[in-house]
Amino acid sequence: MNLLVLSVILAIIIYLIFKRNYKYSPSKINSKIPGPIGLPIFGNILSLDNKNGIHTTFQKWFKIYGPIYSVNMGNKSAVVLTGFPIIKKAFIDNSEAFAPHYTFESRYKLNKCSDITQENGKNQSALKRIFLSELTVTRIKKQESHIQNEIVKLMKVLDKHSEDGKPFLLNNYFSMFSINIISRFLFGIDFPYQDFEETSDLMVGIRDLLIASGEIVLSDFLPIPHSKRSKLYTSYQALVVQIETLVKSHKYKEDDECMLSKLMIEHDKGNIPWDAVISNCNTIITAGSDSTSSTALFFLIEMMNNPTIQTKVYNDIVVSFEQNQQADDYMNESMVILKYSKYRSLIPYLSLALKENYRKHPAAPFGAPHETTQETVIEGYTIAKGTMIFQNIYATQRSDTFYSQPDEFIPERWNGDENSQTLISFGTGIRDCIGKSLAYNEIFTIIASVLNRYEFINPNPSIPFDDNGIPGLTTQCKNTVVQIKKR
């Protein structure tokens, strides 16, 4: 038995060495690109920091090896690109070669990679057509009424906390806000704020899946079996159970405007399989709710850690509202909602602060990995066909190579032409975040409206809030206990 095990291990080692040194292999072609030296078989996998986030390791290596470097992920060859000029050359100037998302075996076993973020095959064009038809400027503007109504419900809850003056946990309320917006878009339903029991499992499920999705799954890169007890598998299946319940309870009508009905119509036409309906609902509810709530929470943390900036943002909002207010800004006698479609260009300092927040706190630190479809030369380096490609978003936006004082929150850096770099907080290229327009709308409207109504206060001002977050596929905001004062 021991001899058999030893023989298998030896065979695997020989296979991996042959594969890595085969002259046409991605690893061999990419070997001329600088990068960290890895271990036999494992490559650089064991050097990746799962605890603090893989993006922190990518940032460290960028400082050593520069804007283009190679990483050996077990038996897979990867290249990490940093800085907008380099990323643009790959994902915009050579868009077709860098367009597909990388197919992880672990993800394929979960849902056959059938959702919009992973699908590269025949269903991708059908899914993209569905999503783009629901995310036009006109359709998003129609969503504004739902966003306004949701903010009113949130404000009624926040008013009570303002009245009692006690510190409270802010995270769940913003998670509920985001889940309700995306649930209205997806299912045509929302949930009450009074009781978190109905959505607490959903909130936890979304958080657990995003954290697990940001960790390395060894079986994706080494010839070992995939485990159904892995955090990724168990968190995905737990969330799917909840999503399937919501899907089955949906009253399907062909004239429905919710996204689920559109997916069901395409399924009935034979354009997408049922697995794709479920997996896309899962992706929409997960990515759609998290990107908004986490980004908004990080913004409010920056406001409390920088109260002078919060005051400047508030004053800018007040001046703009006094000059531009109309009857339709009032949802009732006292509640004002500052809509994105009307106010996005009328509150300049808020726009600078939001841009700075997108820079400092990108929704996904390295996005979804891509795969090259052909051999391509970028900045003199030949990148092999079949190479896994990372957009190093976090290091791009938190490096002093591109921004002075990158760890500081400085809205003024976006004044004039001092920083002409293009933000890539939601990725870039033809496969960037498809829902970013809706996210921009939600985040602007909720931030402008709540800052106009409340001052957000750190109950322990001598201890600034931790703005690093919990690492994962997206960065989760840590539990944030605040006080608010009605203005």
From Swiss-Prot:
Main location: membrane
Molecular function GO terms recorded: heme binding; iron ion binding; monooxygenase activity; oxidoreductase activity, acting on paired donors, with incorporation or reduction of molecular oxygen
Subcellular location: Membrane
UniProt keyword terms in alphabetical order: Heme, Iron, Membrane, Metal-binding, Monooxygenase, Oxidoreductase, Transmembrane, Transmembrane helix
Gene Ontology annotations for the cellular component aspect, listed alphabetically: membrane
Pfam families cross-referenced by the UniProt entry: p450
Residue stretches spanning the membrane: 1-18
Source superkingdom: Eukaryota
EC class: oxidoreductase
Enzyme Commission number(s): 1.14.-.-
InterPro entries: Cyt_P450 (IPR001128), Cyt_P450_CS (IPR017972), Cyt_P450_E_grp-I (IPR002401), Cyt_P450_sf (IPR036396)
Cofactor(s) in the UniProt record: heme
Protein family according to the UniProt entry: Belongs to the cytochrome P450 family.
Protein name: Probable cytochrome P450 513B1
